């Protein structure tokens, strides 16, 4: 037997032999046949092709190859029933001609084969069997190369992909547009706490409003202070006219609250000791807000101290420390007459226990929670009355650490109390 025979030729030979009617037979006159023993037919086909493992599943897959070539097609709704499309012309056709047609079809792609087979099956379902002339013309048109279902499917699939790409690009652009206006918003910074830093303006305005009550001898000094402080007013407060400031503070009582101010520097001089009223007023300023009666007149010698006080107010406004931690600078007393006590050292002579004597110690004027946690351990020392510095006099080289040598706050009396500051240590209380 010829091993080069094709499957459709093998089936046609079996149908033409009457001894094979128990395996395969014709069911109609239009080329329809049925495999009565499909497994036996498959076994014979395996023997012909030298494939002992051949079965009906492999045979049916091989028959699908001829669906594309429009040689054999499956009859729908009937099992093991097939039909020759060009029957009875195929009986008279030269096998070489059919082989050449098969060779032309083998050049097609496998994907075209599968898609065309589906089209043929669907066409068989919808349409009844056509006459042989129309079938042959349709077969020639398909194999002419002008028609290809594969190209149509590829074009349709490419269009779908293009639309999908466009759809995926649009959401990305929308997300980018939504994110772009939202990016600059976190960089906005609101400075809300800046208007609260205005305390240094009040003492300046208060000083200007009290000006008419001071004697004419100190008017020049106050004018000099106004020129020093006036450049700082625009940066601390919103622009207001000077007349509004004067009228706002003119109606208030002479008492004006001053944020943490240092004690005004003073030098011990005879006018301070000879005028106890002035000393009392200056000491009350250190412990309470500054109070200047209308009948108070400053002497020309105190004008220098007022200038130094205003300069230090300006310096304190520039400092960045909290209000509770601002300390007054330490002052050095330049007194010519030595003190008989000589508590500190020979290099620091002190005249008396006047308020100028206590101005060497830094003073915290504002109430602060730090005061309760600061202790003067030197004031609690019971050895202070028996110190060698007290017993040996002022010319000794031994220096005992006293409270005047330390830095810390001390309490001052109010306006109604005594004008002298409170005691520091047992030494000062006895003196």
UniProtKB/Swiss-Prot annotation:
DNA-binding region boundaries: 5-85
InterPro entries cross-referenced by the UniProt entry: Ets_dom, ETS_fam, WH-like_DNA-bd_sf, WH_DNA-bd_sf
Region of interest (Disordered), residue spans: 114-139, 251-282, 294-323, 411-431
Pfam families recorded: Ets (PF00178)
Major place of residence: nucleus
Subcellular location: Nucleus
UniProt GO molecular function: chromatin binding; DNA binding; DNA-binding transcription activator activity, RNA polymerase II-specific; DNA-binding transcription factor activity; DNA-binding transcription factor activity, RNA polymerase II-specific; RNA polymerase II cis-regulatory region sequence-specific DNA binding; sequence-specific double-stranded DNA binding
A cellular component annotation (GO) from this entry: nucleus
Keyword S-adenosyl-L-methionine in record: no
Chain intervals with Basic and acidic residues compositional bias: 118-128, 299-313
GO BP term (any one): regulation of transcription by RNA polymerase II
PANTHER family: ETS, ETS DOMAIN-CONTAINING PROTEIN ELK-4
Function of the molecule: Involved in both transcriptional activation and repression. Interaction with SIRT7 leads to recruitment and stabilization of SIRT7 at promoters, followed by deacetylation of histone H3 at 'Lys-18' (H3K18Ac) and subsequent transcription repression. Forms a ternary complex with the serum response factor (SRF). Requires DNA-bound SRF for ternary complex formation and makes extensive DNA contacts to the 5'side of SRF, but does not bind DNA autonomously.
Name the record gives this protein: ETS domain-containing protein Elk-4
Organism in which the protein naturally occurs: Homo sapiens
């Amino acid at each position: 037997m010829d091993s080069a025979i094709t499957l459709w030729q093998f089936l046609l030979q079996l149908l033409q032999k009457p001894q094979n009617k128990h395996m395969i037979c014709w069911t109609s006159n239009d080329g329809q046949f049925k495999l009565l023993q499909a497994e036996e037919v498959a076994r014979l086909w395996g023997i012909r092709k030298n494939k002992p493992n051949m079965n009906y599943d492999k045979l049916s897959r091989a028959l699908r190859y001829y669906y594309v070539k429009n040689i054999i097609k499956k009859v729908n709704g009937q099992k093991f029933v097939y039909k020759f499309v060009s029957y009875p012309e195929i009986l008279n056709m030269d096998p070489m001609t059919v082989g050449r047609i098969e060779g032309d079809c083998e050049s097609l792609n496998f994907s075209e084969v599968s898609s065309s087979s589906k089209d043929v099956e669907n066409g068989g379902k919808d349409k009844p069997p056509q006459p042989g002339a129309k079938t042959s013309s349709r077969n020639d048109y398909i194999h002419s190369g002008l028609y290809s279902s594969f190209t149509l499917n590829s074009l349709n699939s490419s269009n779908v992909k293009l639309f999908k790409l466009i759809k995926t690009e649009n959401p990305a652009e929308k997300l980018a547009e939504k994110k772009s206006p939202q990016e600059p918003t976190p960089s906005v910074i609101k400075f809300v706490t800046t208007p609260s830093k205005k305390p240094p303006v009040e003492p300046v305005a208060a000083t200007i409003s009290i000006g008419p009550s001071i004697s004419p001898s100190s008017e020049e000094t106050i004018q000099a202070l106004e020129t020093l402080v006036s450049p700082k007013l625009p940066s601390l407060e919103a622009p207001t006219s000077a007349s509004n400031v004067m009228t706002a503070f003119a109606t208030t009582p002479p008492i004006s609250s001053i944020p943490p101010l240092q004690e005004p520097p003073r030098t011990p001089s005879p006018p301070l000791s000879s005028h106890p009223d002035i000393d009392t007023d200056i000491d009350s300023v250190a412990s309470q807000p500054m109070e200047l009666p209308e009948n108070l007149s400053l002497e020309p010698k105190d004008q220098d101290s007022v200038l130094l006080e205003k300069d230090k107010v300006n310096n304190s406004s520039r400092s960045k420390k909290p209000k509770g931690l601002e300390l007054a600078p330490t002052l050095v007393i330049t007194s010519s007459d030595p003190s008989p006590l000589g508590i500190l050292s020979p290099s620091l002579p002190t005249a008396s226990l006047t308020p100028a004597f206590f101005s060497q110690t830094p003073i915290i004027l504002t109430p602060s929670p730090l005061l309760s946690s600061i202790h003067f351990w030197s004031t609690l020392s019971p050895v202070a009355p028996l110190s060698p510095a007290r017993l040996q006099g002022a010319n000794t080289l031994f220096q005992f650490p006293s409270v005047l040598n330390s830095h810390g706050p001390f309490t001052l009396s109010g306006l109604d109390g005594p004008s002298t500051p409170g005691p520091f240590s047992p030494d000062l209380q006895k003196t």
